């Protein structure tokens, strides 16, 4: 009896483990976002050569976030981080209006979404640097990134400012809700 109650208690109150792959073009703000979520403050960053991995606890979920560098020469290495990814956070610099960069961001995103190992991963797009005067709106970015074309993938775009933290937790709220909904749907299918 005691052992059964302890198992139920453990399942109710244990933290869910979720593996997140956070990618995007260089200088989009990925590392700033990671450490703002983890430490609650802005840290001085340098371009990520390789990856940073940290655990962010939020809403009884341990998000293990793999922040992988976005330089052109590093992007082919992203595929080494796909395995067991539950969700993808794609960070875009909303104020980078250079057409080639926007096209590169779209192409890289759609390449990721075409990968078999990421077929079940939810997509959260952080439209970062919304505090800058010429930042594109989420509506504009949705169109430019071709998000409306994603019919078989759960996705959400959240305006953010990594430095102030604006929008970051709203994005994690969507991700948390998605994960719990997905978990409950799986339970329902087993019956």
From Swiss-Prot:
Where GTP binds, per the record, is at: 24-31, 67-71, 128-131
Q: Name one Pfam family in it.
A: Arf
Write out the GO cellular component annotations: Golgi apparatus
Record keyword Ion transport present: no
Could you name the domain of life of the organism this protein comes from? Eukaryota
Lipid moiety-binding region (N-myristoyl glycine): 2
Q: Does the keyword Transport apply?
A: yes
Q: Which InterPro entries match?
A: Arf1-5-like (IPR045872), P-loop_NTPase (IPR027417), Small_GTP-bd (IPR005225), Small_GTPase_ARF (IPR024156), Small_GTPase_ARF/SAR (IPR006689)
Q: Where is this protein localized, as stated in its record?
A: Golgi apparatus
Against SUPFAM superfamilies, the record matches this protein to:
P-loop containing nucleoside triphosphate hydrolases
* Residue ranges that the Swiss-Prot or TrEMBL entry lists as coiled coil: none
Gene Ontology terms, MF aspect = GTP binding; GTPase activity
Keyword terms? ER-Golgi transport, Golgi apparatus, GTP-binding, Lipoprotein, Myristate, Nucleotide-binding, Protein transport, Transport
Q: Which GO terms describe its biological process?
A: protein transport; vesicle-mediated transport
Tell me the NCBIfam families matching this sequence: small_GTP
Question: So what does this one do?
Answer: GTP-binding protein involved in protein trafficking; may modulate vesicle budding and uncoating within the Golgi apparatus.
Stated family: Belongs to the small GTPase superfamily. Arf family.
* Protein known as: ADP-ribosylation factor
Give the species this sequence originates from. Answer: Giardia intestinalis
């Amino acid at each position: 009896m005691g052992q059964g109650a302890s198992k139920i208690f453990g399942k109710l109150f244990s933290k869910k483990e979720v593996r997140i792959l956070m990618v995007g073009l260089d200088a989009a703000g990925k590392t700033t976002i990671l450490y703002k979520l983890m430490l609650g403050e802005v840290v001085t960053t340098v371009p990520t050569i390789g990856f940073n991995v940290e655990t962010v606890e939020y809403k009884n979920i341990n998000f293990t976030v793999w922040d992988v560098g976005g330089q052109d020469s590093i992007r082919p290495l992203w595929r080494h981080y796909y395995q067991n990814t539950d969700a993808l956070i794609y960070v875009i610099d909303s104020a980078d209006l250079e057409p080639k960069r926007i096209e590169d961001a779209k192409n890289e995103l759609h390449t990721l979404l075409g990968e078999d190992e990421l077929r079940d991963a939810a997509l959260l797009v952080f439209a970062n640097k919304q505090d800058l005067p010429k930042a594109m709106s989420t509506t504009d970015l949705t169109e430019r990134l071709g998000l409306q074309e994603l019919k078989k993938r759960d996705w959400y775009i959240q305006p953010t400012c990594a430095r102030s933290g604006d929008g970051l937790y709203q994005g994690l709220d969507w991700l948390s809700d998605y994960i719990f909904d997905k978990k409950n749907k799986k339970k329902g299918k087993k019956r």
